[in-house]
Structure formats: structure tokens, C-alpha cells
Curated annotation (Swiss-Prot):
Homodimer. This is Orotate phosphoribosyltransferase. The gene is pyrE. It comes from Campylobacter jejuni subsp. doylei (strain ATCC BAA-1458 / RM4099 / 269.97). One of its GO terms (molecular function) is orotate phosphoribosyltransferase activity. Its cofactor is Mg(2+). Signal peptide: none annotated.
């Protein structure tokens, strides 16, 4: 499966000057919503991700995603795994569980995103689940931007990764783009202004 080509074919591999949800800047942005708007393609991708997770024989009861970006990927992965699905959402800058969703003590969760950059939002969701008595056993995403180590791809973890080292991350592929702090962003230095297509604060 050529994940990069799928994103390009769907107009989801964008070039410009972007402010990522992590606060970093990048010349490239992956707009997974353009991929996941096709139900058949979403099902195909998440069926493949479910097979990868199943091959590691990890036991879990539910999948949880951070809103908004992770919801479609998480729901489709839950369907493919025949598991329950819930999502966390940001209220007053705090990741919370609402809408009557419950976490029973000792139940095991995989946290699913569409794209993992440093893993900040996924980690916030994991901490929310754990604060309510759940146990997070792993993370999953359609793609990793090259910072967090990926179990099934055997890709190494970089220093700015926020996901815990002791839990696996499963993805369909890696996209390795340069990202920059605002203070040393070459696009900013050329006078360009970053736009924010992502999830936080929108």
C-alpha cells in the first residue's frame, strides 16, 4: 500500500506554510479528512491497520480518539477491530471525556489518531483515559510524521516525541517532513505567514 500516493491522489498532501497542532511550522501538511471522506477508502486503510495490530496480539477493549482529527480514523479502526469507540475533546484547553462516555476501571484502550506528529494530543487523550481508571496499551494512526517510534515499521523514536517509550505505536507509514520552531522557521524568515488547518484552537 503506497500511503503517500493515496494522500497525493486525494489532494491531501498539501504544500505551503502551515502551523501544526504541535505549535511547530512545516512546509507540508497532511489533510487526512480528504482521505477519510471516502468511506470505502477509510475502511480499506483501517482494515489494514487493524490487521497490523492483530498480528501483535495486543488485548484491548476499546479505541479512543482525540477530537476532531482522530474521530474518523478511530471509529473506522474500532469497526475493523469490532471494538467500542469513544472520543475525548478539548474544553477550555483541557482534554476531557463528555457525551455520556464512560471508562470502566481496568478496561484496556488503544488511542487512535489520523496523523501522529509529536503525539501531544494522543498523549493527552491517554492521560484522560488513565485518570478515569482505564489502561492504555498502545497507540495507532494512519501515518506518523517521523518523530515517534513505530513498532511495526521499526522506525526509531526522536527526541521531541511525546508518546511513552514503553507503549507501541502502529501506523501504515511514515511521512518525514522538516518541522520548525517559529523562531527558526525559514518560511517565516521569507515573510510568509503560517496558516492553521489543524485541530487545536479551531
Amino acid at each position: 500500500m503506497n500511503l503517500e500516493q493515496i494522500y497525493k491522489d486525494r489532494g491531501a498532501y498539501l504544500e505551503g506554510h502551515f502551523l501544526l497542532s504541535s505549535g511547530k511550522h512545516s512546509q507540508f501538511y497532511l489533510q487526512s479528512a480528504k482521505v477519510l471522506e471516502d468511506p470505502k477508502l477509510a475502511a480499506k486503510l483501517c482494515d489494514e491497520l487493524a490487521k497490523i495490530i492483530a498480528s501483535y496480539k495486543i488485548e484491548f477493549d476499546s479505541i479512543c480518539s482525540p477530537a476532531l482529527g482522530g474521530i474518523l480514523a478511530g471509529y473506522e479502526l474500532a469497526r475493523a477491530c469490532n471494538k467500542r469507540f469513544i472520543f475525548t475533546e478539548r474544553v477550555n484547553k483541557e482534554m476531557t471525556l463528555r457525551r455520556g462516555f464512560e471508562v470502566k476501571k481496568g478496561k484496556k484502550f488503544i488511542i487512535c489518531e489520523d496523523i501522529i506528529t509529536t503525539g501531544g494530543s494522543a498523549l493527552e487523550s491517554a492521560k484522560t483515559i488513565e485518570s478515569l481508571g482505564g489502561i492504555v496499551v498502545g497507540f495507532a494512526a494512519l501515518a506518523n510524521r517521523g518523530f515517534c517510534g513505530v513498532e511495526n515499521l521499526k522506525s526509531p523514536r526522536k527526541d521531541n516525541a511525546k508518546l511513552p517509550e514503553n507503549l507501541p505505536l502502529f501506523t501504515l507509514g511514515n511521512f518525514e517532513f522538516e518541522i520548525y520552531d517559529e523562531t527558526n522557521c525559514p518560511l517565516c524568515k521569507k515573510g510568509s505567514k503560517a496558516i492553521k488547518p489543524g485541530s487545536r484552537g479551531n
